[in-house]
């Protein structure tokens, strides 16, 4: 009797679906051609046919085609460079320099006509518009601006304010307008509670780095702790765990619905960063799996989050935080177990923590090279110190900010714990030695090979703990050579 064939990949349909969605998003972003709809229809038809025939790889062409169709509907820049009167609502303040402040406006009206996308605007530092305010000014738009993401919105225009600036202090309408006003008030509360560390506190608790000075930003970056200044999966995970702990009870679906609502509110108040949205979707999939009594599968949760967010906006691939967030979890899912077997103490908790830190470092290294080119070895042990401290900053920090309008003195007492954690993180980031290296830019081919090698090294490929992953390590070695020699 013939032995049953083993699958090459121990996975669900989300793995080919994730590959198809990534490929479709890359093609859509690189080409940006409205005629992609024809190829997209072919992909969807092939995926539907494979689904009817119950072929396991049906998700690959299906989501590839859907992403092409979504890309064909993506708007392009419609306004040429020049000077125009503009108006828009301030939704983010990503940076502040000595002489200027950067503000992101959405929706944007240029010469009275609404245009797709958001506008990144440089205004004088004295102006400092508040969240939710409507800003009116004359702007000189740049030619060929770099398309990127700020929060959930795609920045398609960039410019500098000219002449006078006027603002309408009334916040936007609806629930989103309320959330912007609430975020502005929370930033004022954070400044009162956590001074002189209010800049890092606003970054860690609210995702606003506009008050983080250059020296502090560089200290966090060079020490490998920059991820703490951005609201990410760590923050959403802590928020979700605390919410579930506070609403214990027998009605599980009611608990989950309330937890999802509060996590969504948390993401809204922290700027709807793509990394936070990724964590929220994964948390939703995890809770649904628990309620439906399904086996926990990190790769399927990651694939579901990736597919949903790319269908929402394919140009999220241009967002560094989005890519680093997915790269981090991808490394944890694929590399934690293989590395825990190689490192000393692999069967113990400290070995698992060390394997997780190395997994994140290896998975995000090529992406970091495309952002700045510096890799910090110090970030590995410092992350082992900083991540366990994060709940002691996030939970009492948010509790103090929410308590401050009612009981200011009690809020200041609660804030003593996060102030101590902030002081410790600031000292560690400032005093930590710079032990790293500058690496060349990782091209597209080495990047693809690198992540393919990570998958082939993992237990998802021909799962067998006794089998050395020769193929995976070979692919990683080839990717490393191509990366370091900059041949491609």
Predicted regions and their residues:
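Membrane-interface amphipathic/re-entrant loop segments adjacent to transmembrane helices
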Residues: 169, 173-178, 184, 369-381, ...
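Aromatic-rich juxtamembrane segments at the membrane interface
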Residues: 2-11, 151-282, 287-288, 438
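Flexible glycine-rich surface loops and low-complexity tracts that mediate binding to linear polymers
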Residues: 87-90, 131-147
């Amino acid at each position: 009797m013939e032995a049953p064939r083993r699958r090459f990949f121990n996975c669900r349909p989300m793995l080919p679906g994730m590959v198809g969605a990534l490929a479709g998003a890359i093609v859509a972003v690189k080409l940006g051609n409205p005629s992609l709809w024809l190829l997209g229809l072919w992909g969807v038809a092939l995926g539907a046919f494979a689904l009817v025939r119950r072929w396991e790889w049906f998700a690959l062409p299906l989501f590839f085609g859907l992403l092409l169709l979504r890309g064909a509907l993506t708007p392009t820049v419609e306004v040429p460079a020049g000077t125009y009167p503009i108006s828009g609502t301030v939704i983010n303040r990503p940076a502040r320099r000595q002489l200027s402040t950067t503000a992101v406006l959405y929706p944007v009206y240029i010469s009275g006509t609404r245009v797709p996308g958001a506008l990144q605007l440089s205004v004088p530092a004295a102006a400092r518009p508040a969240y939710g305010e409507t800003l009116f000014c004359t702007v000189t738009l740049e030619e060929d601006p770099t398309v990127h993401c700020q929060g959930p919105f795609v920045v398609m225009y960039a410019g500098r304010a000219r002449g006078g600036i006027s603002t309408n202090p009334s916040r936007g309408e609806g629930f989103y307008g309320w959330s912007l006003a609430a975020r502005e008030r929370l930033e004022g509360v954070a400044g009162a509670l956590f001074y002189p560390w209010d800049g890092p506190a606003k970054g860690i608790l609210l995702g606003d780095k506009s008050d983080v000075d250059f020296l502090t930003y560089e200290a966090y970056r060079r020490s490998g702790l920059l991820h703490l200044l951005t609201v990410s999966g760590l923050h959403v995970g802590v928020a979700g765990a605390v919410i579930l702990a506070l609403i214990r009870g027998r009605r599980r679906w009611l608990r989950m619905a309330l937890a999802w609502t509060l996590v969504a509110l948390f993401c809204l108040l922290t700027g709807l960063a793509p990394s936070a949205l990724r964590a929220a979707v994964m948390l939703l999939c995890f809770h649904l799996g628990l309620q439906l009594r399904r086996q926990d599968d990190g790769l399927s949760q990651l694939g579901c989050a990736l597919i949903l967010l790319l269908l929402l906006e394919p140009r999220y691939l241009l967002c560094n935080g989005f890519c680093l967030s997915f790269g981090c979890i991808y490394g944890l899912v694929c590399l934690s177990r293989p590395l825990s077997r190689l490192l000393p103490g692999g069967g113990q908790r400290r070995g698992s923590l060390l394997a997780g830190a190395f997994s994140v470092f290896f998975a995000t290294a090529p992406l970091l090279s495309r952002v700045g080119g510096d890799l910090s070895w110090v970030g590995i042990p410092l992350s082992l110190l900083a991540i366990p401290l994060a709940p002691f900053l996030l939970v009492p920090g948010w509790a103090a900010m929410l308590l401050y309008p009612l009981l200011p003195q009690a809020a200041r007492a609660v804030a003593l714990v996060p102030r101590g954690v902030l002081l410790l993180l600031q000292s560690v980031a400032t005093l930590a030695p710079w032990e790293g290296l500058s690496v060349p830019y990782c091209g597209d081919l080495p990047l693809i090979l690198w992540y393919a090698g990570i998958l082939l090294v993992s237990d998802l490929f021909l799962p067998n703990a006794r089998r050395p992953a020769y193929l995976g390590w070979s692919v990683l070695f080839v990717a490393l050579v191509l990366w370091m020699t900059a041949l491609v």
